[in-house]
Amino acid sequence: MRIAIVGTGISGMVAAHLLCQNHDVVVFEANDYIGGHTNTIDVELNGANYPVDTGFIVFNEDTYPNFVKLMMKLGVAWQPSNMSFSVQSEKTDLEYCPTTLNSLISQIRNLLRPSIYSMLVESFRFRREAQEILRANDYETTLGAYLEGKGYSQTFIHHFIIPMGEAIWSADPKQFNEFPAHSFVQFFNNHGFLNVKDQPQWQVIKGGSRTYVEPLTRSYKDNVRLSCPVVSIKRHPDN
């Protein structure tokens, strides 16, 4: 069978990897490189070269079991990574990292900001209360409506929840008020972000995430059409 696959993101690459064994597969990619969200660039610093991932960065063995199996099959190695969260806002001149007390008060003025302490209290409250969305199976309420309805402060919303969402989804902050609250909370719950303790150990691919692209695409690389965006897809009655 002749099969066309659109995109060389992880889904497209895996689909082509499996299907090309028994079918004639052609992959169409709009970018000029293979990998989609998987993109590693080399950064030179003080004479040393460092691979930096700009898209897919981390995973963990608890919530990415199929990805782990794939990496094992491909013979790709990974290693533990530290993961932290920090915020810097030029507009409000606020900077903090809630990991430790010292990083929280990285700006001395934070000691005199009651909003910082209130925001931390609200973060614990959100972790506790957000589970109710999952229990209620509420798929309609938006994140903005939920936070407003629960009376969360603008400081918590704009300097904690939205920046964290931006970091995870690389999305425009203006979109998050309309983001489904259930999807947001479910992702947080699945990845241990609602827990203060017992969070999963995050891992990174040695040498950058590009390391798995070559072995994953080796069997069909010559059938990838780069810089070839798909304009339309038509379904024919006989197919």
Where in the sequence are the language-model features?
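N-terminal Rossmann-like FAD-binding beta1-loop-alpha1 element of flavoenzymes
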Residues: R2-V27
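Mobile amphipathic helical/loop "lid" adjacent to a hydrophobic cofactor/ligand pocket
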Residues: E61-A181, V185-Q186
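Conserved donor sugar-nucleotide recognition element shared by glycan-biosynthetic enzymes
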Residues: H37, A181, I205, S209
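Helical element adjacent to the flavin cofactor pocket in flavoenzyme catalytic cores
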Residues: Q186-D238
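N-terminal glycine-rich dinucleotide-binding loop that anchors FAD/FMN and/or NAD(P) in oxidoreductases
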Residues: I41-F67
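Glycine-rich FAD pyrophosphate-binding loop
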Residues: C20-E44
